[in-house]
Structures are given as structure tokens and as C-alpha cells.
Amino acid sequence: MRKIILCSPRGFCAGVIRAIQTVEVALEKWGRPIYVKHEIVHNRHVVDKLREKGAIFIEDLQEVPRNSRVIFSAHGVPPSVREEAAERGLIAIDATCGLVTKVHSAVKMYAKKGYHIILIGKRKHVEIIGIRGEAPDQITVVENIAEVEALPFSAQDPLFYVTQTTLSMDDAADIVAALKARYPRIFTLPSSSICYATQNRQGALRNILPQVDFVYVIGDSQSSNSNRLREVAERRGVTARLVNHPDEVTEEILQYSGNIGITAGASTPEDVVQACLMKLQELIPDLSIEMDLFVEEDTVFQLPKEL
């Protein structure tokens, strides 16, 4: 019988849960409005629900009245934003994911030691902007192998590299291999900069790909890790669609006769996954459902001390 294979883990990671709870608890404790620098996570459903509860999402701290509370999103901010918040008398609450903070700390430490840092990631992504702000004169962002080949450093230069936490492990591995080929002495953190949740979700998806011929990645188009999941499937020759609403699950699926895989980005609520699953079952009523467990997750991050 044709079946749906549900990846596990999928959806919310510990950093996203912490960020969302930070906004919710702040609203309960201090009431509305609570200002949030950038979307707390990259998912429209999450942001809309928090906005209804009284969160105000802003990009410019000038929009925040003096002496108000402002939450920094899970993606992190550059030091200049923290400084501006302090100058304006804002009460800052940091919802930056701990794994992003780890990368910030490493960049600061190695920049102080005189290393030039190669930062692998999407240069316009808010996480990369935040990390780069730690040492802008000592950081070079690379997005692909061509940019590695264009780097001006010698093999003897002191170099350190880190990656955006939500990258495709496939792409990151290719870029790192190119870096090490040019700069054999370059090194990184003992553990990967790519976060556990990104690795687990990509691993869970890779695990089911030999069994399916179509994949739905439930996630927002702005979500880096959701887009990387789609690319993981496509790189292995499996058709994949990134959808964020049941209406985007269309009759296109009727063109495919094999099993269907479903996963979700780390900022995707489970109720959106279930709504998309129900729509799929309406289109193909005789589908059975199978859960494929890749690894159990038990990571929990504590809320900011202010809460």
C-alpha cells in the first residue's frame, strides 16, 4: 500500500521553543506591547500568533520607545544592536539560540587572537549579519566554492572557519573540503557549527529518501533550514516542495505514484504539519502513515534570566 512517511525529528527545535516561550512569558509578565527585533523565528504562523498576543516586530530600534523592553530574535544580533539598545535605555532580553551564541563567542575569541575568520553562510541572512558584526574587519563570508577559490590569503595565514548553524550539511562539507584543500592549516570548533537540530532533520530526511519519490517540506519560504531540507531531497533526485499552508498541498501530488515523505523545518509548528497531512489524506484517501524515527531529541534551553 502507498504510504506517507513522517520524519522524526521534525519541526520545532530547542532554540525555537526557547525563543517563542521568551516572547510568550514576557507578554504574560509585563503585558503588551513587547517589542521584538526581527521576526522571532522565520515562520509566518508563529509570528502572526505572537503579534495577536501583543508582540510588535521591528527591524529598527528607533521604532521602540525609550525604556521599553525589546527581545532579540533567535538568530542573534551584532554588537552594534546591543550598544544601540543600551544607548536608548531599552531593556534587552536575549532570545538568541545558544548554538548561535557559541559561534559568536568563537568568532570573538579567535579574532582577538589575530585569526582571520572564514564564515560559511548566506551573507544576507540575519544570523550571518549578526556574527559578522563581532569582528567585521577580520571576517570574510563565503557562500560557495567559487568564493573559496577567490580568497586572497596564503596557506600560512592564521585562519579559522565557522558556519551558519542552519546550512545544508552537503553544501557545507563541499565548501569546507575546498577550504582545507587551499588552506591545510585552517581549523574550526571541535564540534560542528551546524546545529544538532539542523543535522538531525537533514539526517532524518536523508534516511527516508530511498523509500519515496516526493517530499513535502513544511516550512516558511524565509526559513533557511526549511529551504536546506528541500535542497537535501532535490540533491538526491527526489522532487520536493516547500509549503507553509494546507492550501499549498495541491493535486500536483496525484502525478506521483510512490510513497510521500513529510518533514518540517525547525520553526514550523506541528499543527501546520498536521493540517497539511490532513489535506494530503483528502487528496489520496487510502494512504497509510508511518513514522520514521532517526534520533530522539531531548535538548532543552533555559529561558533568559530576566524571565
Curated annotation (Swiss-Prot):
Stated EC number for the protein is 1.17.7.4
Q: Which reaction does it catalyse?
A: isopentenyl diphosphate + 2 oxidized [2Fe-2S]-[ferredoxin] + H2O = (2E)-4-hydroxy-3-methylbut-2-enyl diphosphate + 2 reduced [2Fe-2S]-[ferredoxin] + 2 H(+); dimethylallyl diphosphate + 2 oxidized [2Fe-2S]-[ferredoxin] + H2O = (2E)-4-hydroxy-3-methylbut-2-enyl diphosphate + 2 reduced [2Fe-2S]-[ferredoxin] + 2 H(+)
Q: In which pathway does it act?
A: Isoprenoid biosynthesis; dimethylallyl diphosphate biosynthesis; dimethylallyl diphosphate from (2E)-4-hydroxy-3-methylbutenyl diphosphate: step 1/1; Isoprenoid biosynthesis; isopentenyl diphosphate biosynthesis via DXP pathway; isopentenyl diphosphate from 1-deoxy-D-xylulose 5-phosphate: step 6/6
A GO MF label:
4-hydroxy-3-methylbut-2-enyl diphosphate reductase activity
Q: Residues that bind (2E)-4-hydroxy-3-methylbut-2-enyl diphosphate, according to the entry?
A: 42, 75, 125, 165, 223-225, 267
Q: Which residues bind isopentenyl diphosphate?
A: 42, 75, 125, 223-225, 267
Where, by residue number, does dimethylallyl diphosphate bind? Answer: 42, 75, 125, 223-225, 267
**S-S bonds:** none
Q: Per its Swiss-Prot or TrEMBL entry, what cofactor is needed? A: [4Fe-4S] cluster
Q: Which GO terms are recorded in the biological process aspect for this UniProt protein? A: dimethylallyl diphosphate biosynthetic process; isopentenyl diphosphate biosynthetic process, methylerythritol 4-phosphate pathway; terpenoid biosynthetic process
Q: Which residues bind [4Fe-4S] cluster?
A: 13, 97, 195
Summary of the function given for this chain in its UniProt record = Catalyzes the conversion of 1-hydroxy-2-methyl-2-(E)-butenyl 4-diphosphate (HMBPP) into a mixture of isopentenyl diphosphate (IPP) and dimethylallyl diphosphate (DMAPP). Acts in the terminal step of the DOXP/MEP pathway for isoprenoid precursor biosynthesis.
Name of the protein this chain belongs to:
4-hydroxy-3-methylbut-2-enyl diphosphate reductase
Q: Which organism is it from?
A: Chlamydia trachomatis serovar A (strain ATCC VR-571B / DSM 19440 / HAR-13)
Record lineage = Bacteria, Pseudomonadati, Chlamydiota, Chlamydiia, Chlamydiales
